[in-house]
A protein has these predicted regions:
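Electropositive, gly/pro-rich neighborhoods at or near active sites that engage anionic ligands
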Residues: 1-131, 228, 244-256
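Short acidic low-complexity segments
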Residues: 103-108, 150-162
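Conserved acidic E/D residue at the C-terminus of a beta-strand in Rossmann-like folds
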Residues: 121, 140-143, 195
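A short helix->loop->beta-strand "cap" motif at the edges of active sites that frequently abuts
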Residues: 134-135, 186-190, 210
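C-terminal functional extensions of proteins
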Residues: 192-256
């Protein structure tokens, strides 16, 4: 089963009769708040916006709709719709009631001097802490920037299977590349999904190579809605979220 499908099905089981109270599609992030007060975030791929007067082909407002309806947007190829679906799922899944491990993801990972590490998405604050501790750190982005030692995503096919540790941006769930990336990490000792868009749910990832989920739990919904509406990113809302980690466990099954 595709991971997006499993994520949709799992979140729909929690949605019940919950409805969308508020939604903001910002330049950097998308926020969805449910009528129980819970809020979820997901990255906005602004460069995927097309011309026209509306993001969605509808004359109806989104606020007030059932959460289950927004989760069905996981079936869409539209990256903005996918972000709305993931933000809705995160509002349902990223609850403060779980037993999380606090702190940065890098503190939860054991690196060795001979490790080759693949990082999908340039998490620049983590690079300085990882590169001196390992043999090689490969950074992959949609656009290669060789002057900054950043490789194109096509190079993951060759290099990711050689890595012992993989750090994958959760935006791969939004753009649909997550399944292929996980298939390339089947031999990794540790696979971490990280970023603000990360859905914190063991059930979704328990049959994949993923060993750790690193994301956020909203603690000030009003502040987050304001920041997203104003086009702000992670520096602007870091006081309104808790950065947490959820341990999945060792990889016991290959990802199919």
């Amino acid at each position: 089963m595709a991971l997006r499908t499993k994520l949709k099905d799992t979140a729909q089981q929690l949605a019940g009769d919950l409805k969308v109270k508020d939604i903001r599609i910002g330049l950097c992030y998308t926020a969805v708040q449910l009528d129980n007060g819970q809020l979820g975030l997901a990255y906005t791929f602004c460069d995927s916006l097309t011309g026209g007067c509306s993001v969605f082909d509808t004359s109806q407002t989104i606020a007030g709709r059932p959460a289950k309806e927004l989760l069905s947007l996981f079936d869409s190829d539209n990256l903005i719709a996918s972000a709305v679906a993931l933000a809705t799922a995160n509002a349902l899944l990223n609850s403060s009631h779980h037993a999380y491990v606090p702190g940065p993801a890098v503190e939860q990972i054991q690196f060795y001097p001979d490790d080759q590490v693949g990082m999908i998405g340039n998490f620049s604050p983590l690079v300085r802490g990882i590169r001196p501790r390992v043999k090689q750190l490969y950074i992959f982005e949609r656009q290669a920037r060789l002057d900054e030692s950043i490789l194109g995503l096509a190079m993951t096919e060759e290099l990711l299977p050689k890595c012992q540790v993989a750090l994958i941006t959760a935006t791969a769930i939004i753009n649909g590349s997550i399944d292929r990336l996980l298939s390339l990490t089947a031999n990794c000792r540790a696979v971490i999904i990280l970023g603000t868009s990360t859905p914190l749910c063991r059930e979704v990832f328990e049959e994949t190579p993923v060993t750790l989920l690193s994301g956020v739990v909203a603690k000030n919904a009003e502040k987050l809605l304001q920041v997203v509406s104003e086009g702000g990113g992670t520096p602007a809302f870091k006081q309104a979220v808790d950065k947490v980690n959820l341990v999945i466990g060792p990889n016991t099954q290959c990802y199919d």
